């Protein structure tokens, strides 16, 4: 059944039959509009996008390409094309320093790059492999950055902590840097889980990881882990009761309220209910809420503007809620929307980006 899982993942990474949307998407009774951006065509699901302000951002895909925009997504410049590399995640500390993770070998076809993490110090013009102490990291699926405020010689300053996890299909590994990415350490999480998909750190020490219990999808449950010691140890805070399930992506619009997408790969087409895990106590406990009763809506990305208003991407469409997940309405976010990033500028204005087969901007 592991091969069944790989085939399904490959379909949503390389299928060329995805529909294209070009019409602005205006949420009902909402000022926010999702607008499709013009980008280089890609025959499948692209995985991550990151912005440091309203204008400057980057996205990556499985063709080993990294693109940058300086005008809020109106135009994109290809900064890197690395054959044999499948980029899976990207994050930037500032306009110069950034990191891109790869899914690694022995998962998708034609992937030969064994380097799991790359770093740029010049805004993406050049990228170099990151060295680290600890066990070999096969691949990464997510990166999160925490800025810790402290007093430096009488002035407010920041320390930057960077966390990364992976991968889909196993093995499960964790990477961390506490010095702005200058040095890294890795550790195995195979005793806690078998797959890792996303990470959200609330501060230097506390956070959660989206995981799965088994690399065999037929036996896998969705799993959420929590740490209070910067990833040195983890405890289970949620596990689904059904087979063929994993978690995928996480969104915390506030300190206490958080949401995690639950993926179902059950081949039984009569199993239709899609679910999301929700916490109201900062990730200590979780409850399942229903998304939609359709078997063709496997979940991917999730992003919330506030505690109640959020979006989910699925294989077939997007969904929006304005009441904390009690009800959902179908919207167009393109297909296989894998990552939704929601930001606020200095004036409190909300903007965001989503990436899947296509890129969309929320403003």
Question: Model features per residue range: what roles?
Answer:
Residues 341-363:
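Blade-level signature of beta-propeller repeat domains, shared across WD40, Kelch, NHL, RCC1
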Residues 56-58, 97-100, 157-164, 205-209, ...:
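Entry beta-strands of beta-propeller and related beta-repeat scaffolds
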Residues 46-48, 86-90, 138-145, 194-200, ...:
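Repeated scaffold domains used in trafficking and secretory/extracellular systems
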Residues 24-38, 64-80, 116-133, 175-188, ...:
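Asp-box/BNR beta-propeller loop motif
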Residues 61, 101-104, 164-167, 210-213, ...:
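Recurrent small/Gly-Pro-centered beta-turn motifs in extracellular repeat architectures
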Residues 40-63:
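Beta-strand-rich domains and repeat architectures in extracellular enzymes and scaffolds
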Residues 105-109, 168-171, 214-217, 265-269, ...:
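Short glycine/acidic-enriched loop and turn motifs that connect beta-strands
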Residues 1-23:
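Bacterial Sec-dependent N-terminal signal peptides
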């Amino acid at each position: 059944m592991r091969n069944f899982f790989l085939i399904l993942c490959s379909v949503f990474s390389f299928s060329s039959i995805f529909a294209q949307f070009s019409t602005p998407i205006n949420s009902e009774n909402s000022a926010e509009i999702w607008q499709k951006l013009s980008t280089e065509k890609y025959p499948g699901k692209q995985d991550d996008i990151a912005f440091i302000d309203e204008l400057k951002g980057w996205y990556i895909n499985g063709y080993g390409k990294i693109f940058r925009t300086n005008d809020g997504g109106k135009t994109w410049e290809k900064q890197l094309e690395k054959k044999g590399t499948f980029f899976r995640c990207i994050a930037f500390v500032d306009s110069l320093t950034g990191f891109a993770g790869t899914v690694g070998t022995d998962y998708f076809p034609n992937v030969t790059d064994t380097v799991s993490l790359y770093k740029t110090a010049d805004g993406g013009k050049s990228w170099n492999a990151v060295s680290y102490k600890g066990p070999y990291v096969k691949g990464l699926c997510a990166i999160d950055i925490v800025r810790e405020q402290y007093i430096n010689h009488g002035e407010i300053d920041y320390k930057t902590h960077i966390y990364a996890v992976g991968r889909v299909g196993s093995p499960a590994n964790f990477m961390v840097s506490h010095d702005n990415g200058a040095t890294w350490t890795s550790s195995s999480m195979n005793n806690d889980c078998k797959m890792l998909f996303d990470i959200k750190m609330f501060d230097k020490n506390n956070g959660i990881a989206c995981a799965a219990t088994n690399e065999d999808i037929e036996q896998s449950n969705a799993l959420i882990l929590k740490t209070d010691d910067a990833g040195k140890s983890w405890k289970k805070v949620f596990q689904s009761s059904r087979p063929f399930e994993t978690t995928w992506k996480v969104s915390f619009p506030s300190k206490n309220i958080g949401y995690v997408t639950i993926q179902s790969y059950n081949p039984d087409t009569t199993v239709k209910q899609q679910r999301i895990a929700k916490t109201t106590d900062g990730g200590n406990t979780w409850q399942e809420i229903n998304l939609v009763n359709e078997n063709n809506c496997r979940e991917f990305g999730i992003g919330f503007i506030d505690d109640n208003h959020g979006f989910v991407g699925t294989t077939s469409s997007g969904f929006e809620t304005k009441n904390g997940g009690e009800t959902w309405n179908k919207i167009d976010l393109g297909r296989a929307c894998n990552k939704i990033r929601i930001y606020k500028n200095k004036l409190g204005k909300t903007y965001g980006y989503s990436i899947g087969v296509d890129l969309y901007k929320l403003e």
